[in-house]
Amino acid sequence: MLSFWEQQTYLEYDFIVVGAGIMGCSVAYELRLKYPKARIVVLERGLFPTGASTKNAGFACFGSPTEMISDFKLHGTQKALDIISNRYEGLKILIARLGSDNIGLTPLGGYELMFSNPLSKAELEALNETLMPYFKSTVFLDISSDMDKFGFKNVQQLLFCPLESQIDSGKMMQHYWNLLQLNNIQILTGAEVKNIQGNLVEIVNTIGGTVTLKSDCITLCTNAFINEIMTDVPVKPGRGQVIITSEIERLPFKGSFHFDEGYYYFRNVGKRVLFGGGRNLDFQTETSTKFEFNKLIVNDLKV
């Protein structure tokens, strides 16, 4: 049962945003910029962001060369370019909004390892020419001549992107939440949305009670989890598996690395290596929102 004061204070809003990850925080902040006096609340079912915002590898990236070439074929060149450009512009907004230090930005660049079928000079030049109108600079460089200092084996080609960086995903989300609260945006954790009917949002809180909130504008920013609220939305999750090593003395590389069309990726975290990917080994199982290991993929990553 809610008290008189709780009913007066917590039940009605101008805007309700469901999901307090990167997307939810970004939407809420943009709403604040447009509507300075609006009552805005962000609902998060966990104690901190439940989804990929704090469970990713911490790459500030927008696509490796082979991933882009694959996307050109899959989506069409212009649509793929729009996606790539939006990723890059979004990263710039994130950095400007939160500050480099507050997201742990480390501009070490991004790399792609080619174990077979290296890109020809003409293919790389064509890709850079296609990207030039969006980035205004050369995006990818062939640095295969420097490959030995990285300590990689069986790599035929090494491509470098100076525009990519590493970030600290936990630190980033902590500061995004701080930014919302400084701008009078309320975040309610332990608030799992069970149902939406018109302008009413039914949530279950961590102590087992059911509360109904009201707003004329409700935005769902739960991404992979959206089908738990709206079953008719054609969105499938793409879960990822990530492992991390113990410390490795004299680790020969630093930066963000991809291979196999971006399906595999790794980076240094201090002296440790965070390694993830392999979703292409088991697409069906990885269309899941369960937080559990996929033994097939994890064993492949360990090898």
PLM regions and their residue ranges:
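Active-site lid/adjacent beta-loop-alpha segment flanking the redox-cofactor pocket in flavoenzymes
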Residues: 251-303
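Flavin (FAD/FMN) cofactor-binding and adjacent substrate-gating region
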Residues: 66-72, 96-178, 182-183
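Central helical "cap/lid" subdomain
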Residues: 205-253
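Glycine-rich active-site loop/strand segments that organize a redox cofactor
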Residues: 51, 55-86
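Helical element adjacent to the flavin cofactor pocket in flavoenzyme catalytic cores
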Residues: 154-217, 221
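Extreme N-terminal leader/targeting segments of oxidoreductases
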Residues: 1-15, 33-34, 38
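Glycine-rich Rossmann-fold phosphate-binding loop(s) that bind the pyrophosphate
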Residues: 19-25, 45
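Glycine-rich FAD pyrophosphate-binding loop
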Residues: 32-55
